[in-house]
C-alpha cells in the first residue's frame, strides 16, 4: 500500500469520525464551549508558545504520549495520560505531543485534559489528522498549545485556512512535510516546520530525511525533526548540522518500563 492509499484511508475514516462527533456535540455548541474556554487563563493558551519553548531550550525534546501506532500496534496499552505526560515534564521535556486519534493511535482528546488536570504546564501539541475547523475547536477546548497539520493530508488552500483559524484561536502550527513535493506549503510560514522521517507508505524511518530536506527550508525558522530518533548523537547532529531546534520522540520512551526515566536518561547523554 502506498503512502497516498494509507492517508486516503485515514482521512476518509476521519471524516466519518468527525461527522459522528458533530452529532454528539453540534458545531455551534462546540464554538460556544471553546469560546468559554478561551476566556480562561486571560485568553491565552495553556502551556504558552511551543515555538519559544523549543528555541529557548537546550534539548528541544518533544516527548510524545503514544500508546499505539499503525505499524507497531500497541506500544504501551496500559499507559496513563494522568501519569506519563507529567513524568515527561518533570524529567526535562521541552514540550509534549499527545496523540488524540482513536482508531489508529489509541488516543483521545481527553488525554490532553487529563494531563492538564494533573499539572502539565508546558506546551502540548495536539497530534491528529486535522482536516477541518471543527477539530481545531476540539484542540483549543481540550488544552492544546499547538496543532499538527500534515501537508500530505491537505490541499495548500485547506492548510492555509486551517492555519489561519488555529492562529485566531491562539494556537501555533507545526506543519509536517515528508518530501520535496510538500515544500510548496513552506511558503505558508507556519510557526514550526516539521520533517517526518517516517515513510507512511512503508513505515520505514530514515533520519537522513531531515538532513536532506533541511537545506530546502527557509533560514532562521524553527525546525522540528519527527520520528525515528533513538540516539543522543543523532539529536546533536540534527541540531549542529541541520539547524533543528525540536526533536519529536515517542516510541523510544513509550516502549520502556518508565517513559519519564527513559527521557531523563536520554537527556543526560545529550
Regions found by a protein language model. Give the residues of each.
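An N-cap/entry alpha-helix motif that binds or orients negatively charged groups
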Residues: 2-76
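Receiver (REC) domain switch/active-site residues of two-component response regulators
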Residues: 8, 94, 145, 191, ...
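Active-site beta-loop-alpha junctions enriched in small/polar residues
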Residues: 13, 66-68, 101, 129, ...
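N-terminal active-site wall of soluble small-molecule enzyme domains
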Residues: 60, 65, 72-174, 181-185, ...
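Glycine-rich phosphate-binding active-site loops on the catalytic face of alpha/beta enzymes
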Residues: 98, 138-158, 195-204, 243-263
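Catalytic cores of alpha/beta
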Residues: 131-143, 178-189, 225-249, 261
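Catalytic alpha/beta core domains of metabolic enzymes, predominantly
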Residues: 207-215, 221-226, 230-233, 250
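C-terminal helical cap(s) of enzyme catalytic domains, especially alpha/beta-barrels
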Residues: 212-216, 255-270
Amino acid at each position: 500500500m502506498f503512502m497516498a492509499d494509507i492517508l486516503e484511508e485515514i482521512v476518509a475514516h476521519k471524516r466519518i469520525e468527525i461527522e459522528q462527533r458533530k452529532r454528539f456535540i453540534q458545531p455551534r455548541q462546540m464554538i460556544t464551549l471553546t469560546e468559554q474556554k478561551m476566556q480562561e487563563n486571560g485568553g491565552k493558551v495553556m502551556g504558552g508558545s511551543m515555538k519559544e519553548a523549543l528555541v529557548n531550550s537546550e534539548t528541544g525534546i518533544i516527548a510524545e504520549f503514544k500508546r499505539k501506532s499503525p505499524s507497531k500496534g500497541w506500544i504501551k496499552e496500559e499507559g496513563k495520560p494522568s501519569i506519563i505526560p507529567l513524568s515527561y515534564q518533570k524529567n526535562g521535556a521541552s514540550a509534549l505531543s499527545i496523540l488524540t486519534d482513536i482508531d489508529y493511535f489509541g488516543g483521545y482528546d481527553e488525554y490532553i485534559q487529563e494531563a492538564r488536570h494533573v499539572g502539565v504546564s508546558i506546551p502540548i501539541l495536539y497530534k491528529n489528522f486535522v482536516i477541518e475547523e471543527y477539530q481545531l475547536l476540539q484542540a483549543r477546548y481540550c488544552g492544546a498549545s499547538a496543532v499538527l497539520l500534515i501537508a500530505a493530508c491537505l490541499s495548500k488552500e485547506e492548510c492555509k485556512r486551517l492555519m489561519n483559524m488555529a492562529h485566531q484561536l491562539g494556537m501555533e502550527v507545526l506543519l509536517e512535510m515528508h518530501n520535496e513535493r510538500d515544500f510548496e506549503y513552506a511558503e505558508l510560514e507556519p510557526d514550526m516546520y516539521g520533517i517526518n522521517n517516517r515513510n507512511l507508505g512503508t513505515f520505514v524511518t530514515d533520519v537522513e530525511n531531515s538532513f536532506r530536506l533541511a537545506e530546502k527550508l527557509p533560514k532562521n525558522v524553527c525546525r522540528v525533526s519527527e520520528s525515528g530518533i533513538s540516539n543522543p548523537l543523532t539529536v546533536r547532529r540534527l541540531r549542529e548540522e541541520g539547524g533543528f531546534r525540536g526533536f519529536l520522540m515517542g516510541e523510544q520512551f513509550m516502549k520502556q518500563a518508565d517513559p519519564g526515566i527513559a527521557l531523563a536518561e536520554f537527556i543526560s547523554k545529550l
